[in-house]
């Protein structure tokens, strides 16, 4: 034993290659480690055109509340336009006393406001409305939601400068992409907390997020936060555009379609462990996930490991912010038996996340918007985790 110890003490230390030579030079803009290249958005393109579709945030690979800009979900109706900011203008007109035009540079001179908000596509989670559960990752199923620090000019400041007519009650926003997305917003909301967003997480918003400027409507369905914003019309009635009649409406059981379901309901999802993951062995695991609500802040998240028979309250990461993603955590002792993991969120307005069955009862089977039902992951005895319905 003594000779072995002596040999170990005299053996040369083996250094890994990265400790024996200089590393990469300085760079103008940082990028993720090449070993993390698999952490990426998942694209879902339309069969009609590669420019129509969405890409989802890999929720299962992230921690904290902020989504990196390069992983923030995308949703486009006609691809990402290549806009020259020097030629781009925002026009405010209609029922105003003083029509206005703003260049990008002129808006950058206004006082800025920064807020942490989630953004969620109204179609997020539509795959969980399929008849049979899809075996896919958390991000693929639920990743049309992201959270950022948004910085820009309060819309109320610009509208006050334009002077609103007394009979006006709506604001109609139009994007400068080829689809010319048009959405109507009640003036009361526009004068409350809406931003003309110019920055995301400290840097200028990226093209897929609306460069050089986008409308940002906190807590409301993502499509009203019109990207590539170039026109705001103050009016006495909504535009009744295609995106307010043929799409982005909720199909009801009696065959009617309900318009203007703006606010995103309270929702939560366990991100780890989640779909397509594998638990190595029985033992203690941390069940972690995110919760959010367009009605306010998250007040409570409960977690179940037995398919909803019993619930335990999870810890919420501070600070808990209004209309912002909140991360929750709770330890779980897995005994190796099959389990069903679920989370249920309650917001500051008293709204409780419904079950999948409760959500489906409200709407027609063909409805694909505003799904906020409780989500479930099944854990097999082998440790494999998959999407299940409860």
At which residue positions do the language-model features occur?
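Structured, non-membrane catalytic/scaffold regions adjacent to prosthetic-group chemistry
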Residues: 9-390
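N-terminal export signals
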Residues: 1-10
């Amino acid at each position: 034993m003594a000779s072995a110890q002596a040999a170990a003490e005299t053996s040369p230390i083996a250094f890994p290659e990265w400790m024996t030579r200089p590393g990469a030079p300085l760079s103008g803009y940082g990028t993720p480690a090449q070993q993390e290249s698999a952490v990426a958005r998942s694209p879902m393109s339309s069969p009609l055109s590669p420019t129509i579709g969405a890409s989802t945030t890999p929720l299962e690979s992230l921690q904290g509340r902020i989504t990196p800009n390069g992983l923030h979900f995308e949703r486009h109706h006609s691809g990402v336009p290549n806009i020259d900011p020097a030629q781009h203008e925002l026009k405010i007109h209609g029922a105003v006393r003083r029509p206005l035009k703003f260049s990008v540079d002129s808006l950058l001179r206004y006082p800025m406001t920064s807020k942490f908000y989630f953004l969620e596509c109204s179609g997020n989670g539509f795959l969980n409305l399929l008849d049979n559960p899809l075996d896919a990752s958390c991000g693929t199923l639920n990743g049309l939601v992201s959270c950022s620090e948004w910085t820009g000019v309060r819309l109320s400041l610009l509208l006050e400068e334009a002077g609103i007519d007394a009979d006006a009650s709506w604001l109609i926003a139009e994007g400068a992409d080829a689809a010319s997305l048009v959405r109507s917003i009640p003036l009361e909301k526009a004068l409350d907390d809406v931003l003309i967003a110019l920055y995301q997480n400290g840097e200028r918003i990226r093209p897929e997020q609306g460069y050089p400027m986008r409308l940002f409507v906190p807590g409301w369905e993502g499509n009203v936060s019109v990207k590539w914003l170039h026109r705001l019309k103050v009016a006495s009635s909504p535009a009744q555009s295609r995106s307010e009649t043929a799409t982005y409406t909720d199909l009801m059981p009696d065959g009617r379609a309900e318009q203007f379901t703006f606010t995103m309901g309270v929702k939560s999802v366990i991100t780890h462990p989640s779909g397509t993951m594998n638990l190595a062995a029985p033992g203690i695991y941390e069940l972690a996930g995110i919760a959010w609500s367009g009605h306010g802040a998250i007040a409570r998240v409960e977690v179940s490991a037995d398919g909803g028979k019993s619930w335990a309250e999870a810890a919420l990461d501070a600070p808990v912010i209004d209309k912002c993603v909140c991360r929750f955590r709770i330890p779980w002792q897995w005994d190796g038996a099959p389990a069903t993991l679920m989370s249920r969120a309650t917001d500051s307005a008293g709204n409780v996340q419904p079950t999948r069955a409760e959500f489906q009862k409200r709407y027609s089977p063909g409805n694909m918007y505003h799904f906020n039902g409780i989500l479930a992951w099944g854990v097999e005895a082998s440790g494999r985790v998959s999407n299940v319905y409860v």
